[in-house]
Amino acid sequence: MFGRNPARGPDPGDGESLWIQEVFYTLQGEGPFSGQPSVFVRTAGCNLRCAWCDTDFESSAWKPPLPELLAVIDSRRPRVCDLVVLTGGEPLRQEVGPLVRALLARGLRVQIETNGTLWRDLPFGPGLSIVCSPKTRTLDPQLVPRIDAFKYVIAAGETDPTDGLPALSTQHPGRAERLFRPPPGVPVFVMPRDDHGTPARPGRGEDDNLAEAAASALRFGYRLCVQVHKILKIA
């Protein structure tokens, strides 16, 4: 969306129907579950506008009731797959609690990919993993202790030399901003920003982003991840 999406506030619905962009089966390409077969449920709408975001989460008109959505997930999921990833947009913008509970009741694992700024009362515990990619200075304080891993998008020349993490705003290009930093002991993943299709940055490229992410991991002990699905040219 490259920062052109409307910033939508939390949806007041009860979760018995959700606005969904798409449901698809692929390999999880990022973070702690990288390489694992997964059904992705991409929720529509986001409360932020990240200037480099290349994901379409606004073009769908599909708002299925929960039983219909569960049936579609079941139809996409082969027997070898037990992981469902809720992504966006921002999944916690909507009341995803009923969906998460239904998936856990089926014996499935659920991962939520979130920017961490919104809170929902979820069935935290075994089977549910929260992976946060901070895009702002602060996160919801109730959510922070529930986060299982942090993931940061790294671009060359845009990191803080003291910790190797982003030093520029995601909402206002070029503005210095220290994004939320992870608490001690929580796994941190760094991955290079994919600048394909974004406005050119003179003297910088995707190879530079990868080199900076790798250097950050080596110096500070983070875990480097690359977008496996993009390397394989799959969804």
Curated annotation (Swiss-Prot):
Tell me which residues make up the Radical SAM core domain.
33-235
* Listed GO biological process terms: queuosine biosynthetic process
Binding sites annotated in the UniProt record for S-adenosyl-L-methionine: G89, S133, P134, K135
Q: How is the cofactor bound?
A: Binds 1 [4Fe-4S] cluster. The cluster is coordinated with 3 cysteines and an exchangeable S-adenosyl-L-methionine.
Q: What is its EC number?
A: 4.3.99.3
Query: So what family is this one in?
Result: Belongs to the radical SAM superfamily. 7-carboxy-7-deazaguanine synthase family.
Q: How does it assemble?
A: Homodimer.
Protein name, as recorded: 7-carboxy-7-deazaguanine synthase
Traced from the root, the source organism's taxonomic lineage reads: Bacteria, Pseudomonadati, Pseudomonadota, Alphaproteobacteria, Rhodospirillales
